[in-house]
A protein has these predicted regions:
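Catalytic domains of riboflavin
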Residues: 1-130
């Protein structure tokens, strides 16, 4: 499948087409509540290449199904159903994105402390703790 082939090039795909290539944001659903990010996060969590195909499910009248309608369809067809929020919660519980970067002694007139430096590997934010 060309969409997961590391050697694929833009000219390998017919354009315009019915499957539009999308690029997910680094950090996945923790930085953007998008279907693209959910798709690549699910593939990553499954231990697969972070590439997939996502679609919106349409009703008979051509409009997009909403969450309540999708829940009903999932029940009717015995399908597993999760939301982006469920995926975000799972990732926050099971993955660590704040890493210890440095430790330093901090002697003060009030006593000796240790200072710990951390970095969030998704946002790049730095944090200090005493």
């Amino acid at each position: 499948m060309k969409c997961v082939d590391d050697q694929s090039k833009p000219e390998d795909f017919r354009r315009p087409g019915h499957v539009f290539p999308l690029i997910s944001r680094k950090g996945g659903v923790l930085v953007r509540n998008g279907h693209t990010e959910a798709t690549t996060d699910l593939m990553r969590l499954a231990g697969l290449k972070e590439c997939g195909v996502c679609c919106e499910v349409m009703k008979e009248d051509g409009t997009m199904m909403r969450t309540s309608q999708l829940w009903e369809m999932a029940k009717e067809h015995n399908l597993t159903f999760i939301t982006i929020r469920d995926l975000q919660d799972y990732i926050r519980i099971h993955e660590k994105h704040v890493k210890e970067e440095a430790v330093a002694n901090l002697p003060t007139q009030y006593g000796d402390f240790k200072m710990y430096g951390y970095i969030n590997d998704i946002t790049g934010e730095h944090h200090l703790a005493l």
